[in-house]
Curated annotation (Swiss-Prot):
Binds to the 23S rRNA. One of its GO terms (biological process) is translation. GO terms for molecular function: rRNA binding; structural constituent of ribosome. It comes from Rickettsia peacockii (strain Rustic). The gene is rplO. This is Large ribosomal subunit protein uL15. GO terms for cellular component: large ribosomal subunit. InterPro entries: Ribosomal_uL15 (IPR030878), Ribosomal_uL15/eL18 (IPR021131), Ribosomal_uL15/eL18_sf (IPR036227), Ribosomal_uL15_bac-type (IPR005749). Residues 23-35 have a biased composition (Gly residues).
Length: 153
């Protein structure tokens, strides 16, 4: 026996039925879709339609609302500022503002629309005395900066 003489056992591999390929094929003309109607057309599914019963979207109650006065903050941590100071992207001598954080690529803030809040996650000690002018601070971040001799403007 050679490679070119290999073949499947009889009945091991069945050819799929090719639909809509002539009336004599057994699945021709309408191709198993019946006659007329929505389901015989292309793009059959109607989103959310459940066959006449009240759809799930209507059975569930409306809940909540979107508060327009909610403040959305860009969250940064003290270690993000430490990394930027170590890389030389920020200077410890200057007042650190939102604009300087954007320039140093610590905050991604398009058009300065979002506020910036400083947290102290993963930071228990902070040595550099910085003067910061941001929109909000966590209580632990305030304590760490003031303990290091920094100022919150």
């Amino acid at each position: 026996m050679k490679l070119n003489e290999l073949y499947n056992n009889i009945g091991a591999k069945k050819n799929k039925k090719r639909i809509a390929r002539g009336i004599g094929s057994g699945k021709g003309k309408t191709g198993g879709r019946g006659i007329k109607g929505q389901k015989s057309r292309s793009g059959v599914a109607v989103k959310g339609f459940e066959g006449g019963q009240t759809p799930m979207i209507k059975r569930l109650p409306k809940r909540g609302f979107n508060c327009i006065s909610t403040k959305k903050y860009n969250i940064i941590n003290i270690y993000n500022i430490e990394e930027a100071l170590a890389d030389g992207r920020l200077s410890a001598d200057d007042n650190i503002t939102k604009e300087k954080l954007v320039e140093a690529r610590v905050v991604n803030n398009k058009n300065n629309k979002k506020l910036v809040k400083l947290l102290s996650i993963c930071s228990d000690d902070f040595a550099a005395p910085l003067s910061l002018k941001l929109d909000a601070y966590s209580s632990k971040a305030k304590d760490l900066i003031e303990k290091a001799g920094g100022k919150l403007l």
